[in-house]
């Protein structure tokens, strides 16, 4: 009987998985394989939160495969070595994998291809599995390889259209006797954020249904409301591929309305960042547009930012949410990033690395390029805009409920005064166990403008 290997990466699902479907068409039996790559461990990208969420995802994937007569094979080691070993053990002629956009993904694909070629085997790479529209599917006129501005990209993205979706297979036949390492166990992962969400395809699909049938209708008006949190919280599931971006686009449009269209636009933003990184993989850690910044380094200020003790309540609330949940509202991410890179004038890479250490949805394309967008080294057409945490608080947390939820030291402060506690007088200020601001906003803005040559 013919055998094919399916190497699961960022597509840990059975529904609408073109990689799995292609392998099932290709062979009588398939080997669903996940490799815990040593290269990821060496690079320090196996932080506790994403590792625990991954454990949930793999357990759910294995359960789904067993329900269909198969099982998940897990190996630990170098990806290329383990893939070749499994192919040789099972006699598989071809390996199927979803296309990635990061430098790591490119190196992994190349090494697997070379390892398989030594024994006459092939690697098949499938587009539009991780994203709704494949990077490079649409390109600007004039010889450029990617769009640097979202609006023209979105017009072409909409005109191109998203691929159709596929159902989950009814059966999956796996060869007998294929050895597997144990599945990773969430309960064995230490130092988790206490409010970390659960992962897995079933959890993701339930969240999709709940989102589409209710909160999405208010997304256009409420997505920036920090306390209301009218967001989907689907980003971890998109990152690990337990839900399909293409399926989300179709289902959101079926529901329709302004909320659905606004949500689809955010999915297109995700694709936008992936097509940038696919063409500019160096932008994961190098400036997309160099500004020749001479970044500051202050250990005390960096500690205050990471710990949620800057003295600016909205920034501190955001950072405490990140520590507790391994997730943060997008508006809060923008503010926290602006405060670090423009108010404190610290290298965006320092903040991006901290986010990747904690975020359960730490997608390299979206995390790094959003950090660059805020820092003014990325694709933003207004690179020197500075977000004021007081103004942002009064606009997007007008009653202060988001701050009160994460900064209990300020729970008794009434109204918009919660965003400027340093202005409280007498006993009202003395009774607060909350730090003074680490920096004066006006002085920090002037420093940034001098550094960027704007004064």
Swiss-Prot record:
It is an enzyme of class 4 (lyase). Pfam families: DNA_photolyase, FAD_binding_7. Residues 2-131 form the Photolyase/cryptochrome alpha/beta domain. Its EC number is 4.1.99.3. DNA binds at residue 392. Binds 1 FAD per subunit. It comes from the Bacteria. FAD binds at residues 219, 231-235, 361-363. Its cofactor is FAD; coenzyme F420-(gamma-Glu)n. One of its GO terms (molecular function) is FAD binding. Residues 266-273, 330-331 are annotated as: Interaction with DNA. Belongs to the DNA photolyase class-1 family. This is Deoxyribodipyrimidine photo-lyase. It comes from Streptomyces griseus.
